[in-house]
Regions:
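Preference for long, amphipathic alpha-helical scaffolds in soluble/luminal domains
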Residues: 1-262
Length: 262
């Protein structure tokens, strides 16, 4: 098994500033970037671990969960997050060949309602966040019909308290299922996507910011609800850092983007 695509982009993000200061880090950063680009699937998307392992023969093996654990196809979340890295940290834009292929792959896999399914997080909120932030990072216009359709979908899913929440049932039934309550991580994903698209804060964004601010000290079940994906219908993960990491990132993006615009 190869290293993890998502973890590689996370490490490269952390190394980017230092890579401009010393040759050793610059060399490591370049090797990581080259490996990341080499892992792009032939269809244009990115997998989690293994390149071009989406054979229908493998997924039909008489093994429980073979359709999800025996293959590693391109996914909207990995493709979107890789695009976000390439655009924000590596200077890649819409006319670069790897980006063109990935954007085409993403646009072709948008759901009819405007969302994207995310494989490694729950689920349509996660995938839509990754797709939108990736598309914005490489220069796709916020006015693109696919972007606007996704924004409309996200806005419709916002709860009365200003947050967002999606059930793990979405992952199993491959159809958006509201949780009935908001979670910090899923709110942060939706909010971060809207921030990436809009040049100025919208009412939906402000309501989401207010929710995160109110919930920063919450300690109920919504802060521990599993929002990490594993095997659909079988395994889900509650990452304890998610309630802090994703809200902090969304809040920092809100501050850095809109403070100068106000």
């Amino acid at each position: 098994m190869n290293p993890d695509i998502d973890d590689t982009t996370a490490a490269l993000r952390a190394l980017r500033s230092q890579s401009r200061l010393d040759k050793a880090t610059a060399g490591a950063w370049k090797r990581g970037l080259d490996w990341l680009l080499s892992m792009q699937n032939d269809d244009g998307g990115w997998p989690a671990f293994e390149k071009n392992t989406d054979s229908p023969l493998i997924s039909s093996l008489p093994i429980e969960g073979a359709d999800t654990v025996s293959t590693d196809p391109s996914s909207a979340d990995l493709t979107g997050r890789t695009l976000e890295f390439l655009g924000r940290y590596a200077g890649y834009k819409e006319n670069d060949a790897p980006v063109q292929k990935a954007v085409r792959w993403l646009l072709a896999r948008q759901e009819i309602d405007g969302s994207w399914y995310g494989r490694w997080g729950i689920a349509y909120l996660y995938g839509t966040w990754a797709a939108l932030t990736g598309l914005m990072a490489v220069g796709v216009s916020p006015a693109h019909p696919a972007v606007q359709k996704a924004v409309d979908w996200l806005t419709r899913q916002q709860n009365a308290d200003g947050g967002w929440g999606e059930s793990c049932h979405s992952d199993e039934q491959k159809m958006y299922a509201p949780l009935g309550a908001s979670t910090p991580s899923q709110t942060a994903w939706a909010l971060d996507a809207l921030i990436a698209v809009h040049p100025r804060p919208t009412p939906a964004i402000e309501r989401g910011i207010d929710y995160l601010s109110r919930q920063s000290q919450a300690a109920d079940w919504t802060t521990a609800y599993p929002t990490g994906g594993g095997r659909p219908g079988g395994t889900y993960f509650a990452y304890h850092s998610y309630r802090w990491i994703w809200p902090l990132l969304a809040l920092s993006h809100y501050q850095s983007k809109y403070a100068s615009a106000s």
